[in-house]
Curated annotation (Swiss-Prot):
Membrane topology of this protein: Multi-pass membrane protein
Pfam families: UPF0060
Positions of transmembrane segments: 8-28, 33-53, 65-85, 88-108
Species for this entry: Acidovorax sp. (strain JS42)
Name of the protein: UPF0060 membrane protein Ajs_1473
InterPro entries documented for this protein: UPF0060 (IPR003844)
Family note: Belongs to the UPF0060 family.
Top-rank lineage group of the source organism: Bacteria
Organism classification: Bacteria, Pseudomonadati, Pseudomonadota, Betaproteobacteria, Burkholderiales
Record key words, sorted: Cell inner membrane, Cell membrane, Membrane, Transmembrane, Transmembrane helix
């Protein structure tokens, strides 16, 4: 699977996980309707299913996915929570994405 496809799949997976966790947070922390727990459950189920579509062993998938999760979480922080990102956020995301790329693009025959 090429890097663009892997990156898109990781990004969609991260959004599903973040939505699935953010909605219950709204219920608990901001007193929003408990009905938000239903789409949260759907989103977390989608997240779990999306993880099965990744092209490698589960542990390696989770390790590589972590880099994309960091980047998507920072975008969420800015867009949804309205928090300005710092240069350190950008540097950290770049390092995490570089790590994701190393793990995701390693040769299949490397031991």
């Amino acid at each position: 699977m090429e890097l663009l496809k892997v990156a898109i799949l990781f990004a969609v997976t991260a959004v599903a996980e973040i939505v699935g966790c953010y909605l219950p947070w709204l219920v608990v922390k901001q007193g929003k309707s408990a009905w938000l727990l239903l789409p949260a459950a759907v989103s977390l189920s989608l997240f779990a299913w999306l993880l099965t579509l990744h092209p490698t062993a589960a542990g390696r998938t989770y390790a590589a996915y972590g880099g994309m999760y960091i980047a998507v979480a920072l975008v969420w922080l800015h867009v949804v929570d309205g928090v300005a990102l710092t240069r350190w956020d950008f540097v950290g995301a770049a390092i995490a994405l570089a790590g994701m790329s190393v793990i995701a693009l390693q040769p299949a025959t490397d031991t």
